[in-house]
Amino acid sequence: MNQTNFGFKKVDYTKKQGLVNNVFSNVADKYDLMNDLMSLGLHRLWKDEFIRQIPNLNSHILDVASGSGDIALKLAKKARDRVNNISLTLSDINEEMLKQAKKKAIDLNLFQNLKFTVASAEELPFPDDSFDYYTIAFGIRNVPDINKALKEACRVLKPMGKFICLEFSKVKEGYIKDFYKFYSFNIIPSIGQMIAGNKEAYEYLVESIDLFPSQDEFRIMIKDAGFEEVGYKNLSGGIVAIHSAYIQ
């Protein structure tokens, strides 16, 4: 029986997605607030830098593991302000999270040119060569089979299409690393209990971050999936990294 990690626990591969779904369904209504509290607001700066990696907004963009829609809605607003003809597809396996994204899109009057699809990153319901950009922010570490998801990204991107991933990474500086680990394992779950009423969900999230491959390890995984010109950029001392690659 194939096993994989659900945080620090070993679980049957076929059960992980359901467990992850439960985590996000249980915290969906507090997700955005928790992001602000956990990152001390830094996630907004990280995401702003992330969308700068997309210079051409007259494009077909797929945002995978879209969650509450932060990345897609930032792109939609930027495109509207510049009068660009953007086409955005928001995909997430968790319907509750997509409901949050739809609500935000309506509230911000950004619903035009948006499509919403409930789908697994491992089995995307799109034809080959469909998108100019594939974005995924803080989502790929939750996928049961990351290699399979990377190959799907490769498949749905057009030739010369760009893969862009924002994910928690490995801090190298000693004093930052020590503080970050203490904050992650001791403070974040407590905030999760106080705000979202779910300490276990945030223990899983912290553990999943700790287990995610290093910047260089993930770069190799991306290259092995079939991408070229693979690179990454550290933000905030390596707390997160932006990974990018192209389809030739």
Swiss-Prot record:
One of its GO terms (biological process) is aerobic respiration. The keyword GTP-binding does not apply. One of its GO terms (molecular function) is 2-methoxy-6-polyprenyl-1,4-benzoquinol methyltransferase activity. It catalyses: a 2-demethylmenaquinol + S-adenosyl-L-methionine = a menaquinol + S-adenosyl-L-homocysteine + H(+); a 2-methoxy-6-(all-trans-polyprenyl)benzene-1,4-diol + S-adenosyl-L-methionine = a 5-methoxy-2-methyl-3-(all-trans-polyprenyl)benzene-1,4-diol + S-adenosyl-L-homocysteine + H(+). Its EC number is 2.1.1.163, 2.1.1.201. SUPFAM superfamilies: S-adenosyl-L-methionine-dependent methyltransferases (SSF53335). PROSITE patterns: SAM_MT_UBIE, UBIE_1, UBIE_2. S-adenosyl-L-methionine binds at residues 68, 92. InterPro entries: SAM-dependent_MTases_sf (IPR029063), UbiE/COQ5_MeTrFase (IPR004033), UbiE/COQ5_MeTrFase_CS (IPR023576). Keywords: Menaquinone biosynthesis, Methyltransferase, S-adenosyl-L-methionine, Transferase, Ubiquinone biosynthesis. It is an enzyme of class 2 (transferase). Pathway: Quinol/quinone metabolism; menaquinone biosynthesis; menaquinol from 1,4-dihydroxy-2-naphthoate: step 2/2; Cofactor biosynthesis; ubiquinone biosynthesis. Methyltransferase required for the conversion of demethylmenaquinol (DMKH2) to menaquinol (MKH2) and the conversion of 2-polyprenyl-6-methoxy-1,4-benzoquinol (DDMQH2) to 2-polyprenyl-3-methyl-6-methoxy-1,4-benzoquinol (DMQH2). Belongs to the class I-like SAM-binding methyltransferase superfamily. MenG/UbiE family. PANTHER family: 2-METHOXY-6-POLYPRENYL-1,4-BENZOQUINOL METHYLASE, MITOCHONDRIAL (PTHR43591:SF24), METHYLTRANSFERASE (PTHR43591). This is Ubiquinone/menaquinone biosynthesis C-methyltransferase UbiE.
